[in-house]
Amino acid sequence: MKIQMINLHENFKLINKNLKKKFLKLFSSQKFILGDEVQKLENNLSKINKVKYTVGVSSGTDAIIVALLACNIKKNDEVIIPDMTWISTASSVLLLGAKPIIADVNLEDGTVNIDNIEKKITKKTKAIISVSLYGHMPNLSKLKSICNKKKIYLINDGAQSFGSKHNNKYCHEYTSISCTSFFPAKVLGSYGDAGACFTNNKTLYEKMKIIRAHGQSKKSYSTTLGLNARIDTIQACVLIEKIKFIKKEIRRRSEILKIYHSMLSTIKQINILQPDEKCRANGSSVVILINDKKRFQNYMSSKGVQTANLYDYTITQQPTFKKYQDREIKNSKLIAKNNVCLPIHPYMKNKEVAYVIKCIKRYFKITD
């Protein structure tokens, strides 16, 4: 049996027919940039996420940059980010001339450690970027309270958490701006690069719309610094069709997540990263911590089971960001060293999940 990390083919079968019709209509209209489908997608995303405003952008990375620009992050400002995240969370801050201040994460779920964040807030702190890693949301209610008290922006990098909730609320109900990525492998993925920013603040919304289009407040007239970060109409067409199935897919992911957690929780040799009890995760990833992960992954590969790592290096273990490291940070390094992601996607059958679990137990010589 061969088990893949993701399966994009099954979803394509569902949207193929309607997608072809949309493409033919688009090619006839030739409205490839900010065409009608972009506004339709933004409306659909706002509705499904129960948020007032959505701005479609060209990638998850550009979503963060657009959000930072909208929050007036400038040179020498400090922005607190977790050490365990994708490169762009940190690089977006540096590209604006600001300084990333690195915080540790929690070993239980991989999200940023809020106590560590509080210790790092200074008069120069202008924003905190929380990261909903693996689909797990941090305690955004507590972070929101801190940010309100300190009068700083709260931005959530939700590239992996589309559809996740904390206290039965979506991330943008707590944040100034929430960002997401529609990279193909995401819970809601396009057929290329795309992303979005969500906010309930009209002023920030209007600024982000201008920023994503070279800072133009009207055609050929720039009133603020911006960039070319518009979502293209082709990807909007894809996402409109895929959204029709997203609730069902997230439900199935959550079911699989529960099976993994239930069946693996008794294995002492591994530690399963799990969201806190108030978080309803979207089933983006199943992550375990294990010693000698390469040996384990080679074994799983020999049994036909694909695995992955998110991520092999923390932000400050990489040359670009090495000078921002904090020697007291330990949890993120431990996760980077030992994390293994197991296969999960909405079209995975129960017998396939059972096979993955069976292989893990055999690796540890555990008999039922």
Where are these regions (language model features)?
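Conserved SAM-binding loop
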Residues: 63, 85, 91, 343-346
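Structural detector of well-ordered beta-strand residues that form the stable sheet scaffold
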Residues: 55, 80, 101, 154-155, ...
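PLP-dependent aminotransferase class I/II
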Residues: 9, 21, 36-43, 48-52, ...
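N-terminal "arm"/small-domain region of PLP-dependent enzymes with the aminotransferase-like
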Residues: 1-31, 36, 343
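Phosphate-binding glycine-rich loop
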Residues: 30-78, 92-96, 102-104, 169
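Hydrophobic/aromatic ligand-binding patch that stacks against planar heteroaromatic rings
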Residues: 92-93, 146, 170, 187, ...
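Conserved active-site segment immediately N-terminal to the catalytic lysine
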Residues: 156-191, 206, 218-223
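PLP-dependent aminotransferase-like
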Residues: 69-149, 153-158, 165
